[in-house]
A protein has these predicted regions:
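Active-site loop segments of alpha/beta catalytic cores
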Residues: 18-175
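Well-ordered mid-protein domain cores that form the structural environment of catalytic cofactors
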Residues: 1-17
């Protein structure tokens, strides 16, 4: 049983869009401390964001519960659309902040990729790559909605796939 955090449509209004903060001084201090502590054993590597996996229907279920989500698709479809749109806009805003703050690192190497493998590919980074400013088109991303395994293809398209495609569009590869 799941007691929903969000009980009525107006409760969603309490959520705020993500705001990315980065403290360069603190990050470098921690990086240097790790190097001092581990430098003889292994070399720390300073990287930015490498994991781009999006689970908006899972987030919805975290707030409403799986049973309520299933009922909402029929009883409150506008609430579902408004919420997934809110999540979509939040993710897009967060991604822009990552790019603006230069916080993205390549993930076409031994970085674990959400779908269960490693990111190795020679298709990334994209043409025009600049190592001083990794772009979304230079990296992998993924999205999923396992909660929709029992939902019709039409509802899957309507309630989540169209939003996921919007988020994944700027990425170099998706899986």
């Amino acid at each position: 049983h799941h007691d929903p955090i969000i009980e009525k449509p107006s409760d969603w209004k309490q959520l705020k869009q993500p705001e990315v903060e980065y403290d360069d001084v603190k990050t470098n201090r921690l990086y240097e401390a790790a190097g001092d502590a581990l430098g003889d054993i292994l070399e720390p590597k300073l990287v930015g964001v490498t994991n781009f996996s999006f689970h908006m229907m899972h987030w919805y279920c975290d707030y409403r519960g799986l049973n309520n989500m299933m009922m909402d698709l029929i009883d409150e479809p506008n609430m579902v659309h408004e919420t997934i749109r809110f999540f979509t806009e939040g993710v897009k805003s967060m991604l822009k902040q990552y790019e603006d703050l230069n916080l993205i690192s390549l993930n076409n190497d031994d970085t674990f990729f959400y779908t269960g493998g490693l990111g190795y590919t020679d298709e990334l980074p994209a043409v025009g790559f600049n190592p001083d400013g990794v772009r979304l088109c230079d990296v992998w991303a993924a999205a999923e909605a396992q909660e929709f395994s029992s939902i019709s293809p039409a509802m899957h398209e309507e309630f989540i796939l169209s939003y996921e495609r919007e988020i994944l569009k700027p990425f170099g590869l998706t899986g």
